[in-house]
């Protein structure tokens, strides 16, 4: 990215995620840095509600195919042509290919709805995470924002925030408190990371 250009993070999604709304804090001008924008929504589900959000906000969208994502060029050409230099995952369940990680080294982040390293890995997403937390009688849960590497939910932790797990909590109730943390912290962490990168 050349200095003076807008930093452009795409959002990769596959399942319903409250973070789509949170990320649009960038678009609504709620962040302190005006040069950050959601430049592209990348999705593997053509029926995903986030595509309607993208259309309403006039954000370009790219529907990706599994074979090309894993066995081809992982859409790197399209991302580069769009001027993408930072990738934000929000409910994207596919494992990120090594070729894409290398192409955007240190510029891909994810948010996980619990306190890693607990309750991470393949299959640990959405209500499955919250059910596991409650089943194991944890006293607190939270969110983890981390860099993406070749292993599910394994990259270097950037930020964590906690919330209590209350007696008689359901997975839905816990998820609601987690969503508050996601909306509160994800946009600002994204902003800080991009600002720090641009200042190097």
Segments the model singles out, each with a brief description of its role:
Residues 1-200:
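One-carbon transfer enzymes
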């Amino acid at each position: 990215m050349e200095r003076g250009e807008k930093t452009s993070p795409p959002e990769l999604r596959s399942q319903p995620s409250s973070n789509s709304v949170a990320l649009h804090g960038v678009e609504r001008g709620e962040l302190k840095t005006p040069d950050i924008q959601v430049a592209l929504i990348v999705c593997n589900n053509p029926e995903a509600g986030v595509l309607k959000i993208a259309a309403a906000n006039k954000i370009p969208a790219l529907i990706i195919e599994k074979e090309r994502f894993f066995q081809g060029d992982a859409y790197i050409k399209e991302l580069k042509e769009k001027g993408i230099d930072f990738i934000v995952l929000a409910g994207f369940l596919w494992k990120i290919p090594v070729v894409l990680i290398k192409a955007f080294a240190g510029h891909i982040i994810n948010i996980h709805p619990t306190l890693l390293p607990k309750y991470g890995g393949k299959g640990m997403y959405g209500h499955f995470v919250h059910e596991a937390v409650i089943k194991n009688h944890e006293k607190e849960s939270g969110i983890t924002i981390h860099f993406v590497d070749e292993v599910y939910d394994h990259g270097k932790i950037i930020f964590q925030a906690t919330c209590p797990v209350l007696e008689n909590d359901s997975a839905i109730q816990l998820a609601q408190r987690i969503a508050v943390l996601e909306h509160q912290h994800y946009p600002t962490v994204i902003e800080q990371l991009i600002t720090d990168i641009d200042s190097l």
